[in-house]
Amino acid sequence: MAYDWLKGVADEYDVIVIGSGLGGLTAANVLAKAGHRVLVLEHHYQFGGLATWFTRRGGHIFDISLHGFPSGMIKSCRKYWTREISDAIVPLKDVRFVNPQMDVRTTFTRDDYTRVLVEQFGVERTKVEAFYDHLRAMNFYDNNPETTGEMFERFFPGRDDVKRLLMEPIAYANGSSLADPAITFGIVFSNFMGAGVYTYRGGSDDLVEKMAAELRRNGVELRKKVLVERILVEERNGRKVAAGIVAKGGRVVRAKAVLSNANLKNTILRLAGEESFPADYVTAAKAVRINTSSCQVYLGIRKGESIPYIGDLVFTSANPRFSSTELTDLNTTSRTFSVYYPDTRPGGDRYTVVVSLNARYEDWARLSDEEYEREKQRLIDESIAALERYIPGVGAKIDWREAATPRTVERYTTHFGGTSFGTKFEGLKVSMDLPEKLPGLYHAGSVGIIMSGWLGTINYGVIVANKVDKALHAEKRPAPAPTPA
């Protein structure tokens, strides 16, 4: 008889969180500290969403997410998690860009990026400062239709090399392209330009384990290996409302509010179902474009071997010019090396390299099993060959090679289209409007590009948790007494 992963779970909670990505976990923590009874359900065998890890024979630990985020993570983790977590967030010292148009090393701070643009690229300092000021002034509510590509051309006409330096790291960070609204670049880039790129010392395993411990201290019930099949929808006073979840196997757990940390389209079209929403909202949800996916190659260096320091994040490409299309092509030459040195996990002596490539789900979904295995092997071989340029002879030091594709992302996250970056910009409004269309249901996943990445999803989790808290308190307030005639 299969083990019951819901054994001991109560029949009702104040809030059920579906999914345990950073947005879901943070929302759960905020709500628990506000005094609500919270249940988190995760279908995977460990928590963290895409901020996760896996182990392999030979003592290897591989982190999944590209390990770089803005300094704002320090403040957010201190405020919504613990000082112990925030104190482990440290700067990455060396970000590199190597392609036919440039060979740049930078700390990725505003001052250093300005130095690179002025000294290496010959851009006038006044133009650089004007560009930064424009980005800082951007507002979500301005509804500016300008695209990122159009904005670049306005500030740096004809300078494809400058556009590449600006766009490439953000494309890896959140899947955005030159055709996306300029605000999707501006907000994220400005966040990075504050104080550079940071990472979590200790690895994703240490981070998520500390988060899980904090959640339990605050009374959150955490359960993994539980697949939510659908959101329980009932009719009350002539209107449909979210009333809980139905897990695989049929177990019903009720709740005053359900917060989905799943993909937005999964939440609306699969979990709640089209029939639960007004027709115009379903049309808007279907029109939301899914963002791109990713491939990764995991390279483990044999115990006892070492590799030289080549930088923390190395953005590389053999493509002559920057192209959002080439960046996601099945045969792209554009890849990022995330290099994990022993100080990533203090006390250890191991080196690993995670190679990240942006990708399109449809390119991988159509492959036969034989073609799929062949393409994965090509990814591995080409990634090692590219790494040899920076570390000659590294292939002989590697004793674990493995590749993941958009199909892997889909398998472990159930995301629509295997997306690793949520939705395009229009998804943010659909996500924010969810509780108006189906009371009791909220969404705090990766949406709109600006709510992507570790910092974006944590902050969105806080925003949505505060909405849930406000709604729950409003429910508890007694109805006002009728006014005497």
Residue ranges of predicted features:
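N-terminal glycine-rich phosphate/pyrophosphate-binding loop and immediately adjacent elements
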Residues: 2-123
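A glycine-rich dinucleotide-binding beta-alpha-beta segment and adjacent secondary-structure elements
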Residues: 164-173, 389-451
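Mid-domain catalytic core of redox enzymes
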Residues: 229-348
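Active-site-proximal substrate-binding core of FAD-dependent oxidoreductases
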Residues: 233, 469-485
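A conserved FAD-binding loop/helix module that cradles the flavin
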Residues: 446-468
